[in-house]
Structures are given as C-alpha cells and as structure tokens.
Curated annotation (Swiss-Prot):
Residues passing through the membrane, by range: none
SUPFAM superfamilies, per the entry: NAD(P)-binding Rossmann-fold domains
Protein name as catalogued: Dihydroflavonol 4-reductase
Top-level class of the enzyme under EC nomenclature: oxidoreductase
Signal peptide coordinates: none
Length: 366
C-alpha cells in the first residue's frame, strides 16, 4: 500500500461473489472496510465475511439498499475510497425495467451523491461489465475501452442476461456524467466472465454461465460461445491496484484469457473426464473466430495477471464440490439419459438456494 493510501474504504455488495473476495484482500492489506449488505443480521448471508481474518477489528457491516436514496450515506461517511459492486441480478425477472435496470442506474447515482456528501471520498471504483462493451450485432475481433454496447440491438434480441447488460451500460454512462465537475476520481473496471474459487455459500451467478457446460444450462451457451475470462483473484487485485494507483483514470478492461465454446469444452472434458461435456452445439458454427477483450491499457500500467484458464476452472469446480454445489460426476446421469435434470436435482437436494442460483442466477449482487 502507498504511504498516502487511505486506510478506510467502503465496499458495496460486499456479501457477493466478487465483493466478499475483494473485502478479504483489502483486510489482508490492512484496510478498514465498511461493507454494505442488504441485511447485516442475516448470518447465513454474512457469516463468510465475519469469519475473515481481521474482520473483528477492521470490518464493519452496514445495511444499505440501492433503491433507497441516502441509505449508503452512513457507510460511506469517513471513507477515502468506495468500491461499488452492488447490482441487482435476476435473469428471470418479470419486470426487468423496474427490478434490474432502474435500480442499477439510480443506485450508482445515489452512491455518487453519498460520496459527495461525505466530503472525504477521493476515488470511486465502479465494477462494470463486459456487457457494456460487446453487445453488438457483429462481433469485432478485438474490443477495447473505447467500445460501447448497442442498446437498440440488445433490446431487440433480448438474449440471456440482456437486462444486466442494459443496466450496466446505462449505469456506467450515467456515472461518468454525474462525476464530471466534482473532486472524486472515477474509474470503471470492465471484467469479462469471472471464474475461480469463492467464499460465498451459494452458487455465484457468474459461475452459472462459466460452468454451464457441466450443468447443461444451454441458455448460457450463447455467452460462452466466444468467451473471455478473468480469475476472481486477478480481478480483485486489479481493483486494489487501480485504486492505489494515482495515475489511473478512465475505463479499464480486466480480462486475461479468450476461448471459444469448443475450446472450453475440450479443456473441461480433458481435465475433468468425470463430467459429461457436449461436443456438438446446434446453431453454433464448428469454426469460430476468437473474440478478444484487450487488457493492454491495464497491463501497460504494470499490472500482471497471475492465473491461467485451467486455474480459474479448477478453483471454481473444487470450491463448488467442497460446498456441495456440484456433483463429482455427471457421466452416470448422462448414461441414464438424465444429465441436466440429474445435476439440478443434486443441487436442489443440497440447498434450495443453490438451485435458485444455478437455474436463474440469484438476486444477490455479484
């Protein structure tokens, strides 16, 4: 940590997949962390935070809600930096405009107002999404920070997770406008699909997509058809690195590996032969070009990625197995002609929340 780095920061969405790992890394570095969650009294959802090393002395939980103006004021007061990760996620929402899109936009604007009111916040780091960049009819070979998704195209297609892509795009653009003219440095980090080990108790929404070849969740194949990936730990290290870098500004793509669905299927099939992995995908071409997200801007600052694609999936699969979120094999279920139902049945019998997470991405923030 730099000598003049702030000691106190706020992390929104701290109980989630990315947020909890970021809190862990911040505590390790000696930061005092104000972590916002929906309900600090719900031990089932915050126990993993309270059990972190240094949590007793350096972690405080705050109740906050993106839909309630001013609910982040108290948590942000006295902080020098804010990491905004909280976001509504429910890919099966019946009212995405009011349940996903509006709360995401209004939430980031409310947090910016809380930062201004605090008068202590110097930097706001916003966790954006690859969906703000490549939501376009014709995929480019390489994307960088200058690209933005075509919302008209997304609205017309309404592909899996479309409301998440729209909400993140509009929220990031609104944040850039709202932070002009104040003394708060605003940075957005654009992760691709986040994969790796985790400390939350339920199936992370990101892994619903990443492990869809194992679970047979075909609705998510379109997302990994020409996929880009980053390890959870690399992403959290990137957040802290850019926060501590006084020269950091603008948007930063954080992505270390690219793979088509065919390449990913081969990697998983070779490394974990106990899982049935499809090799043919109706409607998806056999020969697919790689679509890459360039992290050149980030790497040019001196940041280094530590993990490869196999590391990401090993961490994710091992953790899911340890927590009872994935069976150790699906070959038997496939032989019996019941691959997908077998996996879903296994998860449901272990925890109803896990089933909810696998099938529709739980409403918890990332």
């Amino acid at each position: 940590m730099e000598e003049d780095s702030p000691a106190t920061v706020c992390v929104t969405g701290a109980a989630g997949f990315i947020g909890s790992w970021l809190v862990m890394r911040l505590l390790e570095r000696g930061y005092v962390v104000h972590a916002t969650v929906r309900d600090p009294g719900d031990l089932k959802k915050v126990k993993h935070l309270l059990e972190l090393p240094k949590a007793q002395t350096n972690l405080k939980l705050w109740k906050a809600d993106l839909t309630q103006e001013g609910s982040f004021d108290e948590a942000i007061q006295g902080c020098h930096g804010v990491f905004h990760l909280a976001t509504p996620m429910d890919f099966e929402s019946k009212d995405p405009e009011n349940e996903i899109i509006k709360p995401t936009i209004e939430g980031v604007l409310s947090i910016i107002r809380s930062c201004v009111k605090a008068k202590t916040v110097k930097k706001l780091v916003f966790t954006s999404s690859a969906g703000t960049v490549n939501g376009q009819e014709k995929q480019l070979h390489v994307y960088d920070e200058s690209h933005w998704s075509d919302l008209d195209f997304i609205y017309s297609k309404k592909m899996t997770a479309w409301m998440y892509f729209v909400s993140k795009t509009l929220a990031e653009k609104a944040a850039w406008d709202a932070t002009k003219g104040n003394n708060i440095s605003f940075i957005s980090i654009i992760p691709t699909l986040v994969v790796g080990p985790f400390i939350t108790s339920t199936f992370p929404p990101s892994l619903v997509t990443a492990l869809s070849l194992i679970t047979g969740n075909e609705a998510h194949y379109s997302i990994i058809k020409q996929g880009q990936y980053v390890h959870l730990d690399d992403l959290c290290e990137c957040h802290i690195y850019l926060y501590e870098n006084p020269k950091a500004k603008g948007r930063y793509i954080c992505s270390s590996h690219d793979a088509t669905i065919h390449q990913l299927a081969k990697i998983i099939k070779d490394k974990w032969p106990e899982y049935y992995i499809p090799t043919k995908f109706p409607g998806i071409d056999e020969e697919l070009p790689i679509v890459s997200f360039s992290s050149k801007k980030l790497i040019d600052t001196g940041f280094e990625f530590k993990y490869n694609l196999e590391d990401m999936f090993k961490g994710a699969i091992d953790t899911c197995r340890e927590k009872g979120l994935l069976p150790y094999s699906t070959i038997k279920n496939h032989i019996n002609g019941n691959h997908v139902n077998g996996v879903h049945h296994y998860i449901k019998n272990n925890d109803d929340d896990h089933e909810k997470g696998l099938l529709c991405c739980s409403k918890e923030g990332q």
